[in-house]
Design a protein with these regions (language model features):
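Predominantly flavin-linked oxidoreductase catalytic cores and closely associated redox partners
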Residues: 108-247
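Glycine-rich FAD pyrophosphate-binding loop
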Residues: 6, 22-42
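Conserved Rossmann-like nucleotide-cofactor binding loop
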Residues: 13, 36, 153
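A conserved beta-strand/loop capping segment in the N-terminal third of enzymes
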Residues: 51-104
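Beta1/beta-strand and adjacent pyrophosphate-binding region of the FAD-binding site
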Residues: 1-13
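Flavin (FAD/FMN) cofactor-binding core of flavoprotein oxidoreductases
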Residues: 249-261
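Conserved N-terminal glycine-rich FAD pyrophosphate-binding loop of Rossmann-like flavoproteins
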Residues: 34-57
């Protein structure tokens, strides 16, 4: 079958593309290399811009935990900022665990008429320098347009010439979920004075993103510009940050094993 659009990648970008195209009456197929229900490691925070994009697609986000602003902490200083009220975006964000968020968008894509296929790793088919479709499990599926929504580090992106600049600054992060009685708070919290177990400042930040379901997404991220970055142990850094927020958040033990990206 010839499709109008083939989408590689079932994250928010890919599923949003499939939703829009299917609603416009186009024949759309989306390929997700993971199974249905796969999780994507993330901080789970949605900005007002993201909520605005969901509104444009008429996506119901009422199940997500509403976030009204940001609490920033640097040393002993603390400041709370509300999301601004503008004509461009709503004045609130949300926390929506990626497993639930991504699955919801894929469900909407299917309901909109897109052909969504799981456990299907697709690669672009190139003929005479033109992408004419995708190959999945040895099968060639042709499409008038192929949309790559896998990120720049995937095999498909590299086939199309995406190359990472080795001198470009990058970051690493790790997160876990933990129970807290403060899970229903409506501010994201970011600690800008992150330190390792030796007390050395780390260029990055720690976060507490309340999920509204009894848990908080706790995580830390660091930039490659820091001295000794290659020796940085993210699990140790997360534990160090957790020791600081454990008392004020009445934080319980991690529900799952911390995962990095």
């Amino acid at each position: 079958m010839q499709f109008d659009i083939a989408v590689i990648g079932g994250g928010p970008g890919g599923s949003s593309t499939a939703i829009s195209a299917a609603r416009a009456g186009l024949r759309v197929v989306l390929f997700e290399k993971g199974p249905y229900g796969r999780d994507k490691v993330c901080g789970d925070g949605l900005t007002p811009r993201a909520i605005g994009a969901l509104n444009e697609l008429n996506i119901d986000h009422s199940v997500a935990h509403r976030i009204d602003g940001l609490r920033m902490i640097a040393g002993k200083k603390k400041r709370e900022l509300s999301w601004p009220t503008t004509d461009r975006f709503p004045n609130h964000g949300a926390v929506w665990p990626r497993q639930k968020f991504d699955n919801h968008l894929l469900d909407v894509a299917i309901e909109s008429g897109a052909d969504v296929r799981f456990n299907a790793e697709a690669l672009p088919v190139i003929e005479d320098g033109v992408v004419v479709g995708v190959e999945v499990n040895g099968e060639v599926i042709r499409a008038s347009l192929v949309v790559l929504a896998t990120g720049a580090q995937g095999a498909a992106a590299k086939m199309l010439g995406a190359v990472r600049d080795p001198d470009e600054t990058f970051g690493l992060a790790i997160r876990a979920y933990a129970p807290t009685p403060r899970h229903a708070e409506r501010h994201l919290e970011a600690c800008l004075s992150l330190r390792d177990e030796h007390g050395t400042p780390v260029p990055g930040y720690g976060w507490m993103f309340p999920a509204g379901d009894g848990t908080v997404n706790i995580g830390v991220g660091a930039l490659s510009t820091m001295k000794g970055f290659k020796k940085l142990n993210l699990n140790t850094l997360l534990d160090q940050y957790a020791s600081i927020v454990r008392e004020p958040w009445s934080l319980g033990d991690y529900i799952d094993k911390p995962r990095a990206w």
